[in-house]
Amino acid sequence: MPELKTCLLSSLALPLAFALPASALEFKLGPLEADLTLQADAQGAYFDDGVGDTDTGSNIDWTVRFNLERILDSGWTVGLRAEYSDAYDTDTDVDGPNSKTELDEIYVYAAGAWGRVEIGRQDGPADTLSLHAPQVGMGQVRGDFARYVSGPASLSAYDSQNEPKAIYLSPPIGGFRFGVSYGPEMRVNEDDPNPLRRTIQDNHVELAAQYQVPVNGVVLGVSGAYVHADADAATMHEDISSWSAGTELRWQHLRVGGAFVSRGDSNSFAGRDEEEVNLGAAWLEDRWSVAASAAHIERSDLSRDLAGIGGTFQVNDYISLSADVVGFTDDYTMGPSESGFAVLGQIRLSL
């Protein structure tokens, strides 16, 4: 049964961000198998904010992941997974869009030949099944640079993040798989004094599908996703209505992928009509990986171009090093253009 479990879980969880594996403490709790991962990142950046100023910034991040599971006599795998991560901005003058974030995931799951069900706080299928520009280490155009300058690419549809939901993921059948999720409410920054930063959406639904086929040693994949939710009238924001279509090519160590994303006016206050095209490539080795990606974003008030390159290297089982260089140009409809860059470095300790 362990071989069946490994095959099934790997087939139902396509990685979207390529990163070298972290170490984990594995142990048994009676009939249950458990693993615990502790991770800490120290990050520094040198950046030009696009208005003629250069500065430095730094962040300290930490993450704890815990997984507890059991294989039943029926062949089902059942378990509980929890994750908590926190990011601390060590510079009070740096307040990028992703600084001081807290992300919680906790959900129960069951998997078998019929597929996989997850219930709790977890990313939905619009995120996990969507193909797009690959990411390595710090993420390139959808990465940590956005803590310091500009804003990140979406890569896929506007999804319900890790808000509470029920998820079903089908097993792969002839290279095809699909997923669906439903959640009663989505609450992000609902107490923020700035109403523009509040997200209060109800009845969020995600639908996603993916198809992969091998052709002469090359694996070709396509994906599609759709997300809808109903905005709370008190916020005066728009409903979430977003979709994306992506593709990926895999050949040995090479990954090439891209996507078109339509976010429309999703959760916007005054209408944004946002669309994005992203494209990238990655080369993945056992101890190191590199990637390059680019994105063009159009919305009612802004045209944004992003380009980035980065890599990661596993020093040993406990230490990895990552670096990114990302450049941006923000062309505002009602203002001057801004161009700048961010150079980031990071050391990660894992146990």
Language-model regions: role of each:
Residues 213, 319, 339-351:
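Outer-membrane beta-barrel "beta-signal"
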